[in-house]
Each structure stands twice: as structure tokens, then as C-alpha cells.
Design a protein with these regions (language model features):
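N-terminal Rossmann-like NAD(P) cofactor-binding module of classical short-chain dehydrogenase/reductase
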Residues: 1-2
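Beta-strand-loop-alpha-helix segment that lines the small-molecule cofactor/substrate pocket
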Residues: 6, 11-59, 73
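Flexible loop/turn segments at secondary-structure boundaries
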Residues: 10-11, 33, 60-61, 88-90, ...
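A structural signal for well-ordered alpha-helical segments within the folded catalytic domains
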Residues: 11, 15, 38, 60-64, ...
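A short, conserved acidic/glycine-rich loop-to-beta-strand motif
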Residues: 52, 79-82
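Core domains of carbohydrate- and sulfate-ester-processing enzymes
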Residues: 82-126
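Rossmann-like dinucleotide-binding domain that binds NAD(P)(H)
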Residues: 107-175
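Basic phosphate/pyrophosphate-binding loop/patch that engages nucleotide-derived ligands
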Residues: 42-49, 65-78, 97-102
Length: 175
């Protein structure tokens, strides 16, 4: 089962797939929070299933070769990595509350997340920017950068410290 849904659904869908005897490939971020991640791991063990978390750069032949060169010492001893993303995201506006479209089962879409009055800013890509459904740009893009840094350094445990900087400098929207 491949899971590519809003973040707030990842854990339940993965657990249900394991219960159904299916292996799982889940897009980033694997879960919405740490508790859900632990429950996914428990389900994988309990039902003897494979649950794989996917990030973009792991599938790139060029990146795999670069990481191999890095780990083979081509540029010496690498002791620090920085993941940087400079991306302007478009203004999503302040669309406010509106009528749920007849083509959307909003209760099903919300699923395990709190039921909020419908807003066009909660669905489609914009759900990323609302904590009930997504993890902001850290969960949307930071996962890829963190993975690449850890992979390049050859570390298999979480970092002790991460620094993040950023802000909302341009748009006055509901992100």
C-alpha cells in the first residue's frame, strides 16, 4: 500500500494496512507526531509487515553516488551538514469559512483530525500549513533536507540539536 495523503492520515492508514496484511510505503513525513510514529512501528512488528518511509532524494541515482563519494572520504572528513531551502511560497490568502463543496466528504477528509469549519485553505495543497492536518514547511520540505544531511554524514540516530530559522516576511495570509 502506498500512502500519499495529508499527514494527519498517515499513521491510521499505515496501521490499517498492516492489520490487513499489507506492506506499506508512506510518503514524508511518516507521521504527524512521535506518538503516531511509535504506533506505526508497533503495528509493523505486531503484524510482521514492512513499513518504509520515503523521501525524495533517496531515489536519485546522482544523489546516491554523491553520498557514496562523500562517505568514502572524497572531500575529507565531513563533520557537519546544513540543509537549506530557499523557496517562496505563494500567498494562500485569507479565504475564511465557506460552504463545503458537494464533491467533498469533509468529515471523511478530516478523519482523525479535529473537525473545523470548512475553509478552502484547509484542503488540497494548503493543508500543509495548518497543524491539524500538516507539519508546516519543516514537515513538508525539512524532512528531505534533514534526511540528506544525516545520510551524507552516515549517522543513524537523530541529531542532538537542530537549528531552524525563517519567518513570514511577505504574505498576510492564514499560513
Amino acid at each position: 500500500v502506498t500512502i500519499a495523503s495529508p499527514n494527519h492520515w498517515h499513521a491510521l492508514q499505515a496501521i490499517w494496512a498492516c492489520q490487513a496484511g499489507k506492506d506499506v510505503y508512506v510518503e514524508k513525513p511518516a507521521t504527524h507526531n512521535l506518538f503516531e510514529g511509535r504506533k506505526m512501528i508497533e503495528a509493523a512488528y505486531k503484524y510482521n509487515r514492512i513499513v518504509q518511509h520515503g523521501v525524495q532524494l533517496r531515489s536519485s541515482i546522482a544523489i546516491r553516488e554523491a553520498v557514496k563519494h562523500l562517505q568514502d572520504g572524497l572531500i575529507g572528513n565531513v563533520y557537519m551538514a546544513r540543509g537549506l531551502v530557499f523557496r517562496q511560497r505563494a500567498d494562500i490568502g485569507n479565504k475564511g469559512i465557506s460552504q463545503t463543496p458537494s464533491t467533498l466528504n469533509y468529515d471523511l477528509w478530516c478523519g482523525p483530525a479535529p473537525m473545523r469549519p470548512f475553509s478552502k485553505n484547509y484542503v488540497h495543497y494548503n493543508w500543509h500549513w495548518h497543524w491539524d492536518y500538516g507539519n508546516g514547511d519543516v514537515g513538508n520540505q525539512g524532512v528531505h533536507e534533514t534526511d540528506l544531511c544525516m545520510w551524507g554524514l552516515g549517522v543513524d540516530k537523530l541529531p542532538e540539536r537542530i537549528t531552524s530559522m525563517g519567518g513570514k516576511f511577505l504574505w498576510d495570509d492564514c499560513k
